[in-house]
C-alpha cells in the first residue's frame, strides 16, 4: 500500500516510519508537514492511504481532509497523540470523510512491534475494505407476524463521513420521536463514548452507548459502543458478540441489520449513510426482502459514496434520498 504521512512533528513522523517498517508491503511515498502541502502533494501523487495529524500550521488536518476528499479522494486515517483533547476535531474530520482514528504509536518502548500493532491493524482493515466485494448471500428471516404492540425501530449504519451525517439526521428528529434508534458507526471503542456525548449535545436527543442486554426504547438513540458486533436477539434485547470473526469492520452494519431482519417483529426502517466500502449493503437488502422500508443516502450528499452506492447496486434501498430529506421521511413514516 502506498502511504503518505502528514505531520509537523519529527518524532511522530519517525514513530510512524518505524511502525510501517514492520510491514514491507507498505511504502511511504511522501511526507508533508502541514495540510496545505498535503493537498498539493495529493494532486501530484495520490496515495492509497494518508496518516493525517490534526494540529498543524498553515492548514490543520480537518480542513486538509475536507479538501483532499473533495479534490483527490483517498483513504484517510487520523493519527493523534491526545484523543480526549482533540475529540471534536476527530469527529469533524470523520464528517469530511476520514475513515478512522488511531493513537500515534509509542516510540522507544520495550516492544515496538506491539506498539505498532493497532496502526497496522487499521491499515490492514482499510486495505481489505477498499478491495472487498458485495456478497449475495440470502438471509433467512423468521416469518413476520403482526406484533402485539407497535414496536418501532430505526436501524442506521454509517462509516466515513458518518458523524457529521448523523448530526444532521438526528437534528431533524423531534424529541418526541416515537421510534427507538440504534446507530452502528465504524469507530473505535475508545472514541465511541465521546461520539455519543458529542451527538447528544449537537442534536438535542438522548444519545448514549448501547448496553449489553438492554431493549431499544422509543425516543432513545443507542450507539454501538465496543469493537465487537452488536446484534438484536430473539427476546428483543441487544448483545455484543465477537462472531463472525471474518467481518473486518467492528461493529459490522451487516451483522446488526441482519439480526433486525431475523428478530424484530414490529415496524422498522433501515438507513444506510455515507461510508467507504460495502458494509451494510447486504444487510439493507435483507431488511428490504423482509418487507421493511430501507433508505440509502444519495451520492450528492454523501461524503464518501461507497456503502450507499453498493446498496443501490444490489437494489437494497426502497428509497434513495439526500441526507436532509431522511429525517423528515422518518417522521412521516412513524407519525402516520
Curated annotation (Swiss-Prot):
Annotated GO biological process: chemotaxis
Lineage of producing organism: Bacteria, Pseudomonadati, Pseudomonadota, Gammaproteobacteria, Pseudomonadales
Residue intervals of the CheB-type methylesterase domain: 147-336
Record function comment: Involved in chemotaxis. Part of a chemotaxis signal transduction system that modulates chemotaxis in response to various stimuli. Catalyzes the demethylation of specific methylglutamate residues introduced into the chemoreceptors (methyl-accepting chemotaxis proteins or MCP) by CheR. Also mediates the irreversible deamidation of specific glutamine residues to glutamic acid.
Similarity annotation: Belongs to the CheB family.
UniProt remark on domains: Contains a C-terminal catalytic domain, and an N-terminal region which modulates catalytic activity.
Record's keyword annotation contains Membrane: no
Name assigned to this protein: Protein-glutamate methylesterase/protein-glutamine glutaminase 3
PANTHER family: PROTEIN-GLUTAMATE METHYLESTERASE/PROTEIN-GLUTAMINE GLUTAMINASE (PTHR42872), PROTEIN-GLUTAMATE METHYLESTERASE_PROTEIN-GLUTAMINE GLUTAMINASE (PTHR42872:SF6)
CC per GO annotation: cytoplasm
Keyword Manganese: no
Reactions performed catalytically: [protein]-L-glutamate 5-O-methyl ester + H2O = L-glutamyl-[protein] + methanol + H(+); L-glutaminyl-[protein] + H2O = L-glutamyl-[protein] + NH4(+)
Record Pfam families: CheB_methylest, Response_reg
SMART domains cross-referenced by the UniProt entry: REC
EC number(s) given by UniProt: 3.1.1.61, 3.5.1.44
Amino acid at each position: 500500500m502506498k502511504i503518505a504521512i502528514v505531520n509537523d512533528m519529527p518524532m511522530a513522523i519517525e514513530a510512524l516510519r518505524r511502525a510501517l517498517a514492520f510491514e514491507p508491503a507498505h511504502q511511504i511515498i511522501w511526507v508533508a508537514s502541514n495540510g496545505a502541502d498535503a493537498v498539493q502533494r495529493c494532486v501530484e501523487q495520490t496515495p492509497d492511504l494518508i496518516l493525517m495529524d490534526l494540529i498543524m500550521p498553515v492548514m490543520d488536518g480537518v480542513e486538509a481532509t475536507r479538501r483532499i476528499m473533495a479534490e483527490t479522494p483517498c483513504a484517510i486515517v487520523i493519527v493523534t497523540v491526545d484523543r480526549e483533547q482533540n475529540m471534536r476535531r476527530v469527529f469533524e474530520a470523520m464528517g469530511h470523510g476520514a475513515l478512522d482514528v488511531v493513537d500515534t504509536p509509542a516510540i522507544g518502548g520495550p516492544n515496538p512491534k506491539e506498539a505498532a500493532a493497532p496502526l497496522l491493524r487499521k491499515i490492514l482493515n482499510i486495505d481489505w475494505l477498499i478491495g472487498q466485494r458485495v456478497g449475495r448471500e440470502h438471509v433467512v428471516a423468521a416469518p413476520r407476524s403482526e406484533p402485539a404492540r407497535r414496536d418501532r425501530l430505526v436501524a442506521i449504519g454509517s462509516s466515513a463521513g458518518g458523524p457529521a451525517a448523523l448530526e444532521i439526521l438526528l437534528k431533524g428528529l423531534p424529541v418526541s420521536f416515537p421510534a427507538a434508534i440504534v446507530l452502528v458507526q465504524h469507530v473505535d471503542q475508545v472514541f465511541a463514548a465521546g461520539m455519543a456525548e458529542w451527538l447528544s449535545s449537537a442534536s438535542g436527543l438522548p444519545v448514549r452507548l448501547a448496553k449489553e442486554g438492554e431493549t431499544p426504547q422509543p425516543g432513545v438513540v443507542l450507539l454501538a459502543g465496543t469493537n465487537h458486533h452488536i446484534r438484536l436477539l430473539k427476546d428483543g434485547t441487544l448483545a455484543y458478540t465477537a462472531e463472525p470473526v471474518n467481518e473486518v469492520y467492528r461493529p459490522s452494519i451487516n451483522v446488526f441489520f441482519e439480526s433486525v431482519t431475523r428478530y424484530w417483529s414490529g415496524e422498522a426502517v433501515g438507513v444506510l449513510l455515507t461510508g467507504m466500502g460495502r458494509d451494510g449493503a447486504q444487510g439493507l437488502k435483507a431488511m428490504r426482502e423482509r418487507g421493511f422500508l430501507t433508505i440509502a443516502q444519495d451520492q450528492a450528499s454523501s461524503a464518501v459514496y461507497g456503502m450507499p452506492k453498493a446498496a443501490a447496486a444490489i437494489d437494497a434501498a426502497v428509497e434513495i434520498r439526500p441526507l436532509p430529506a431522511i429525517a423528515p421521511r422518518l417522521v412521516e413514516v412513524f407519525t402516520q
